[in-house]
Amino acid sequence: MLPPIVLASQSPARRQLLEAARIPFRVQPSYFDESQIQSPDPVELVQKLAAAKAEAVAAQQREPVLVIGADSVLYLGGEILGKPANALEAERRLRQMRGEVGELYTGHALIDTRQNRRLVHYAVTRVFFAKPSDEEIRTYVATGEPLNCAGCFAIDGRGSLFVERIEGCPGNVIGLSLPLLRRMIQELGYSLTEAWN
């Protein structure tokens, strides 16, 4: 039987993905200091960060649960782009992204406290960016939306205007690849569709 699911994330987008799939869960942010983990490799970075977030929350559980940890970055032009520090950085990055193709990596960590098992995987989606004008970029940044997003854009929000197309899992760009999560849960011997019963 599928244990209760705990999402170790403050991300509203990740919550919305699980809610849309009708997967019951509760939220318990990890508050892990992400600056403790550095890597020039986006795959290694998102996997380590996702695992650290999940482990921080799993250590606090008193009942058997499945803890989901996740972290996303945009890799563009050989540079890892997380959330921008401020509006000026967001504008600079969005200008840099014009007409480019980036890769959005999301690390997925799953800890089963019942079986004491841990899985860590990642998903990658290619993102083809439009060429917004300077005025469009300034207006978008003024909404505040890009300040809370890896790579400075929210494909499920206003930022969708600036994405021409993607190759890969759409949910991954939002914050969780539900197909990957389903496979990981199956690897632990459960079915995510049990949550619908």
From Swiss-Prot:
Its cofactor is a divalent metal cation. It is found in: Cytoplasm. It catalyses: a ribonucleoside 5'-triphosphate + H2O = a ribonucleoside 5'-phosphate + diphosphate + H(+); a 2'-deoxyribonucleoside 5'-triphosphate + H2O = a 2'-deoxyribonucleoside 5'-phosphate + diphosphate + H(+). One of its GO terms (molecular function) is nucleoside triphosphate diphosphatase activity. It comes from the Bacteria. It is an enzyme of class 3 (hydrolase). Gene3D superfamilies: 3.90.950.10. Signal peptide: none annotated. GO terms for biological process: nucleotide metabolic process. Its EC number is 3.6.1.9. GO terms for cellular component: cytoplasm. Its main location: cytoplasm. The active site is at 71 (proton acceptor). Keywords: Cytoplasm, Hydrolase, Nucleotide metabolism. It holds the Pfam family Maf. Nucleoside triphosphate pyrophosphatase. May have a dual role in cell division arrest and in preventing the incorporation of modified nucleotides into cellular nucleic acids. Belongs to the Maf family. This is Nucleoside triphosphate pyrophosphatase. It comes from Synechococcus sp. (strain JA-3-3Ab).
